[in-house]
UniProtKB/Swiss-Prot annotation:
<dbReference type="GO" id="GO:0046081">
    <property type="term" value="P:dUTP catabolic process"/>
</dbReference>
<feature type="binding site">
    <location>
        <begin position="72"/>
        <end position="74"/>
    </location>
    <ligand>
        <name>substrate</name>
    </ligand>
</feature>
<dbReference type="InterPro" id="IPR029054">
    <property type="entry name" value="dUTPase-like"/>
</dbReference>
<keyword id="KW-0378">Hydrolase</keyword>
<keyword id="KW-0546">Nucleotide metabolism</keyword>
<dbReference type="InterPro" id="IPR033704">
    <property type="entry name" value="dUTPase_trimeric"/>
</dbReference>
<dbReference type="Pfam" id="PF00692">
    <property type="entry name" value="dUTPase"/>
</dbReference>
<keyword id="KW-0460">Magnesium</keyword>
<dbReference type="GO" id="GO:0004170">
    <property type="term" value="F:dUTP diphosphatase activity"/>
</dbReference>
<comment type="function">
    <text>This enzyme is involved in nucleotide metabolism: it produces dUMP, the immediate precursor of thymidine nucleotides and it decreases the intracellular concentration of dUTP so that uracil cannot be incorporated into DNA.</text>
</comment>
<feature type="binding site">
    <location>
        <begin position="89"/>
        <end position="91"/>
    </location>
    <ligand>
        <name>substrate</name>
    </ligand>
</feature>
<feature type="binding site">
    <location>
        <position position="85"/>
    </location>
    <ligand>
        <name>substrate</name>
    </ligand>
</feature>
<keyword id="KW-0479">Metal-binding</keyword>
<protein>
    <recommendedName>
        <fullName>Deoxyuridine 5'-triphosphate nucleotidohydrolase</fullName>
        <ecNumber>3.6.1.23</ecNumber>
    </recommendedName>
</protein>
<dbReference type="InterPro" id="IPR036157">
    <property type="entry name" value="dUTPase-like_sf"/>
</dbReference>
<comment type="pathway">
    <text>Pyrimidine metabolism; dUMP biosynthesis; dUMP from dCTP (dUTP route): step 2/2.</text>
</comment>
<comment type="similarity">
    <text>Belongs to the dUTPase family.</text>
</comment>
Length: 152
């Protein structure tokens, strides 16, 4: 069963008039984030370039939760545009604007218009770890095998 939590959202002046992030299907894990760029000033991402794109909102996550900013698969597949620091993490104590760091890995310039769906935001529970220093670790079949060690 899906858990639902309440999140306070503040709409910033440049986000006025844009819809709130929304889930596009009944079982979607992420809600789409929209670009809050000025209508007369779209952001053009040249191939190989990146830009911080505003969403026009800030959020107050409940303690024990984070928001992950992830790429939209369609933008990546069709245009090579993705979230550079994927997943971007928004901590529960952050109150600044939610922004999306996009990069264009494609071969053509990509224009981001106001209201365009640019990323998705997934709300997740946070588990904190307590680290314990030791001189040995338990044995596993994999051992210290790293990159590529489990085959192709």
């Amino acid at each position: 069963m899906t858990q639902t939590i309440a999140i306070d959202v503040r709409i910033l002046p440049h986000g006025a008039g844009l819809p709130l992030p929304a889930y596009q299907t009944a079982h979607a894990a992420g809600m789409d984030l929209l670009a809050a760029v000025a209508p007369d000033a779209p952001v053009v991402l040249a191939p190989g370039s990146h830009a911080m794109v505003p969403t026009g909102l800030s959020i107050a996550l409940p303690d024990g939760f984070e928001a992950q900013v992830r790429p939209r698969s369609g933008l990546a597949a069709r245009h090579g545009v993705t979230v550079l620091n994927s997943p971007g993490t928004i901590d529960a104590d952050y109150r600044g604007e939610v922004c999306v760091l996009l990069i264009n890995h494609g071969k053509e310039p990509f224009t981001i218009q106001r209201g365009e769906r640019i990323a998705q935001m997934v709300i997740a529970s946070v588990v904190r770890a307590e680290l314990a220093i030791t001189t040995t670790l338990s044995e596993t079949a994999r051992g210290s095998g790293g990159f590529g060690s489990t085959g192709r």
